[in-house]
């Protein structure tokens, strides 16, 4: 298996948040073995765990003790892919910067600054098959010695039905895939107070028969690649790198988190949490 890992030095990222439209800054701090992944905002530590999820509509948000951080899935996905197990992610602002809409900038900076530690990783290993479903969407998890994630989408435009499978070792096949939306969704997203920082610089915008971004798609199946990337980020809310085989049909953050909670419950996940017994979401 592998050793726990942190970063060699502090790493900083900054930019606009896709939903708040506000400027924010992120500082990743090295931590010792056994610390885990945690966020830090205004004096409050928020463990990157499913118990602290407070919102899953168009993003995965965490909160604790009156502090909330939006859109954690991309940075968590990169940390998961690189098996970084011990860092504190300091957030100055209310949301993780969206950067170009993909995980590439996070991935490149962190990959070059990995520090192996002296403790073996305690992986979360899927022990038996489990399925979660909701209104025609489903995710299935099965045992596997590696992490394998398949996403199948059914889109109401020129994309049609697409499918992509990620296997360990092919991280660069998904970290460049950008977050996306459809032009008919934009009005609703804005109406509910989200997407304030979205633009063609950080979001792949698709119509019935066109791509609005002048550079076009990075891959013909870029949206399903990004969905795989998102799911890997949400899976890291189990608290450890995951070994299992996953298949998602039309899943999103809400179903991803539902799966995580079911896996944790079924396997009686009782790892120590760095907080007092009662966990209260915002």
UniProtKB/Swiss-Prot annotation:
Changing residue 234 to A: Almost loss of activity. 1.5-fold decrease in zinc content. InterPro entries: Ribosomal_Su5_D2-typ_SF (IPR020568), UDP-acyl_GlcNac_deAcase (IPR004463), UDP-acyl_GlcNac_deAcase_C (IPR011334), UDP-acyl_N-AcGlcN_deAcase_N (IPR015870). It is an enzyme of class 3 (hydrolase). Changing residue 19 to Q: 2-fold decrease in activity. Pathway: Glycolipid biosynthesis; lipid IV(A) biosynthesis; lipid IV(A) from (3R)-3-hydroxytetradecanoyl-[acyl-carrier-protein] and UDP-N-acetyl-alpha-D-glucosamine: step 2/6. It holds the Pfam family LpxC. Changing residue 253 to Q: Loss of activity. Its cofactor is Zn(2+). Its EC number is 3.5.1.108. GO terms for cellular component: membrane. It catalyses: a UDP-3-O-[(3R)-3-hydroxyacyl]-N-acetyl-alpha-D-glucosamine + H2O = a UDP-3-O-[(3R)-3-hydroxyacyl]-alpha-D-glucosamine + acetate. Keywords: Hydrolase, Lipid A biosynthesis, Lipid biosynthesis, Lipid metabolism, Metal-binding, Zinc. GO terms for molecular function: metal ion binding; UDP-3-O-acyl-N-acetylglucosamine deacetylase activity. One of its GO terms (biological process) is lipid A biosynthetic process. The active site is at residue 253. Changing residue 19 to A: 20-fold decrease in activity. 2-fold decrease in zinc content. Zn(2+) binds at residues 74, 226, 230. PANTHER family: UDP-3-O-ACYL-N-ACETYLGLUCOSAMINE DEACETYLASE 1, MITOCHONDRIAL-RELATED. Belongs to the LpxC family. Catalyzes the hydrolysis of UDP-3-O-myristoyl-N-acetylglucosamine to form UDP-3-O-myristoylglucosamine and acetate, the committed step in lipid A biosynthesis. This is UDP-3-O-acyl-N-acetylglucosamine deacetylase. It comes from Aquifex aeolicus (strain VF5).
């Amino acid at each position: 298996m592998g050793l726990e890992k942190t970063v060699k030095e502090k790493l900083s990222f900054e930019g606009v948040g896709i939903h708040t439209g506000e400027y924010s800054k992120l500082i990743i701090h090295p931590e010792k073995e056994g610390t885990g992944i945690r966020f830090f905002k205004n004096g409050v530590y928020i463990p990157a765990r499913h118990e602290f999820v407070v919102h899953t509509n168009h993003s995965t948000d965490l909160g604790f003790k009156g502090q909330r951080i939006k859109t954690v899935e991309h940075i968590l996905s990169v940390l998961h892919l690189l098996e970084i197990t011990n860092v504190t992610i300091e957030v100055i602002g209310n949301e993780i910067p969206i950067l170009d809409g993909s995980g590439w900038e996070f991935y490149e900076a962190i990959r070059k600054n990995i520090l192996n530690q002296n403790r073996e990783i305690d992986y979360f290993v899927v022990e038996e098959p489990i399925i979660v479903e909701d209104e025609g969407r489903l995710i299935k998890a099965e045992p596997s010695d590696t992490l394998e994630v398949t996403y199948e989408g059914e889109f109401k435009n020129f994309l049609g039905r697409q499918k992509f499978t990620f296997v360990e070792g092919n991280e660069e096949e998904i970290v460049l895939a950008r977050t996306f939306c459809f032009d008919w969704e934009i009005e609703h997203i804005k109406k509910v107070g989200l997407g304030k920082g979205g633009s063609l610089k950080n979001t792949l915008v698709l119509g019935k028969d066109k791509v609005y971004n002048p550079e076009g798609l990075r891959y013909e199946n870029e949206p399903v690649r990004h969905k795989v990337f998102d799911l890997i980020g949400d899976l890291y809310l189990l608290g450890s790198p995951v070994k299992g085989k996953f298949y998602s049909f039309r899943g999103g953050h809400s179903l991803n988190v539902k799966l995580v909670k079911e896996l944790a419950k079924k396997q009686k996940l009782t790892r120590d949490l760095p907080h007092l017994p009662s966990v209260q979401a915002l």
